[in-house]
Design a protein with these regions (language model features):
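Alpha-helical transmembrane segments in multi-pass membrane proteins
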Residues: 13, 17, 73-81, 127, ...
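Short, amphipathic, aromatic/basic-enriched membrane-interface segments that mark the entry/exit
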Residues: 37-45, 99-103, 158
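Alpha-helical transmembrane segments of multi-pass membrane proteins
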Residues: 8, 115, 119, 123, ...
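Juxtamembrane boundary at the C-terminal end of a transmembrane helix
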Residues: 227-236
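Alpha-helical membrane segments and immediately flanking helix-loop junctions
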Residues: 2-62, 163-177, 182-206
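Selected transmembrane alpha-helices and immediately adjacent juxtamembrane segments
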Residues: 68-150, 226
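Transmembrane helical segments that form the transport core of multi-pass membrane transport proteins
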Residues: 114-188, 192
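Membrane-core helix-loop-helix motifs of multi-pass transport proteins
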Residues: 33-87, 202-226
Length: 236
């Protein structure tokens, strides 16, 4: 069983993948297991891409075989960032222990996570389809740029693939597979417009601030990008 809602929210957020981190924090806040401040804290560092998807699809698509260093950076940085926030901006978060009678058992937690995941996957699919249909916009933009002589020398195919990644990162990863992996790896913590819209809808329901969430994500993106630069230059 989980001794506190904070432990449960952290584990689900890290292992079940986006958007389960934000959704779990919202659900626990709605059920009054945590405060609004504690929900904001959990969303700041747990709402990440799932490790199974990261290892089984993202890294192989980018041609990366030595997965351990990338896995350590992708999830180690948010975890350390969460610990840092816990000692600084979110010191007031108590995460009271759950009474014995209300503690969440592992089986019940798994069952609840599966139910939430089914609803999340349906919503995720809707955003995925919607934003992938907008892939035509980067293509039209690049074609428009191609009519201007001064931008002919720009890497237009790369720019188009990168813009697609910004729109919807799941489909954009495949389009970026021919380019250095650093560009995609740098976008993963933020997740592109699709992830931001989903997170925004959840945060709005909880009365949480999307700009605050994005600020935390941008800080982690910068840190992860810096560590990936070191790893890639080290030959991993």
């Amino acid at each position: 069983c989980f001794p506190s809602a904070g432990v449960y929210g952290t584990l689900v957020g890290f292992f079940c993948g986006f958007p389960m981190g934000a959704l779990t924090a919202y659900t626990m806040y709605e059920e009054k297991q945590i405060t609004q401040k504690e929900a904001e804290y959990l969303c700041a560092f747990t709402n990440n891409m799932g490790p199974v998807y990261f290892c089984s699809y993202v890294l192989p698509t980018l041609g990366i075989t030595n997965k351990l260093p990338y896995l350590a950076v992708m999830y180690g940085i948010p975890l350390l960032y969460g610990l840092f926030l816990r000692k600084t901006a979110y010191q007031s978060c108590a995460f009271q222990k759950l009474p014995s009678g209300s503690r969440v058992s592992l089986l019940n937690a798994i069952d609840a996570s599966i139910q939430q995941a089914i609803a999340s996957i349906t919503k995720l699919g809707g955003y995925l389809i919607l934003l992938q249909t907008l892939y035509i916009l980067p293509e039209l933009f690049i074609r428009l740029l191609g009519h201007f002589p001064l931008v002919i020398r720009l890497p237009l195919p790369f720019l188009q693939a990168f813009l697609c990644c910004l729109l919807e990162i799941t489909g954009g990863i495949a389009k970026m597979s021919a380019y250095p992996p650093l560009y995609v790896l740098a976008l993963l913590p933020l997740g592109g417009l699709s992830f931001i819209l989903q997170a925004g809808s959840i945060l709005k329901n909880a009365g949480l601030s999307l700009p605050v969430y994005l600020l935390h994500k941008l800080i982690q993106t910068a840190l992860i990008f810096a560590f990936y630069v070191v790893i890639i230059h080290a030959g991993f």
